[in-house]
Regions:
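Acidic, surface-exposed loops and disordered segments
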Residues: 1-189
Length: 189
């Protein structure tokens, strides 16, 4: 059995420390091709991308981030719109998530690292990057070469899995921000 995809999935980690080495335009195009290969409802492809690799534009972007200022040499702002979608729910956000995951997985294949940022000032980011009304910046992917390597890891936990019905007698301990900060302090993130 070929386990390449599974191994890539486990190797994908949120890296928060990058070298200064630039990502080539060829690799950026490969990342965007992977992104656009993501599934989307009715193949409506609600995404668009702003590639940011100029230092002054990166500085402006990081000023919009509430957290997650990791100063990678490349950022991709993934934007989306549902203006062309006949139903008006938030399902298109799943399409954007699949798109982002494809980029993060392809980063692993290219020897790059990434972290997905969802906490930012949406209005300010839209203004700075001339994002038109009706288009939303959904997430920012910071991408670069990792400053250090992390081992692949499975976060599988049996208590997150329910069979046939949701078993309310089982209690799952959810991870907290304190857990994240402890992991960072211990060099695990």
């Amino acid at each position: 059995m070929n386990r390449e995809v599974y191994n890539t999935i486990l190797a994908r980690r949120s890296i928060r420390s990058f070298t200064d080495k630039k990502v080539s335009h060829e690799d950026i195009r490969t990342l965007l091709e992977a992104a656009m290969a993501a599934p989307s409802a009715c193949n409506l492809q609600p995404w668009s991308f702003i590639v940011v690799d100029a230092q002054d534009r990166l500085a402006a972007l990081y000023d919009c981030a509430e957290q997650g200022k990791y100063y990678a040499p490349l950022a991709i702002i993934i934007c989306g719109t549902n203006s062309h979608i006949p139903w008006k729910d938030d399902g298109w956000l799943f399409d954007i998530g699949a798109c982002a995951e494809n980029i993060m997985l392809e980063c692993v294949e290219l020897g790059l690292a990434s972290v997905c940022i969802g906490g930012f000032d949406e209005a300010r980011l839209s203004e700075i990057f001339s994002i038109p009304e009706g288009v939303r910046p959904v997430c920012i992917l910071e991408i670069g070469y990792p400053a250090w390597e992390r081992k692949p890891n499975s976060w599988y936990t049996e208590d997150a899995v329910h069979w046939q019905i949701y078993d309310t007698d089982r209690e799952r301990k959810m991870r907290t921000l304190e857990d994240l900060h402890e992991d960072i302090k211990n060099g695990q993130m």
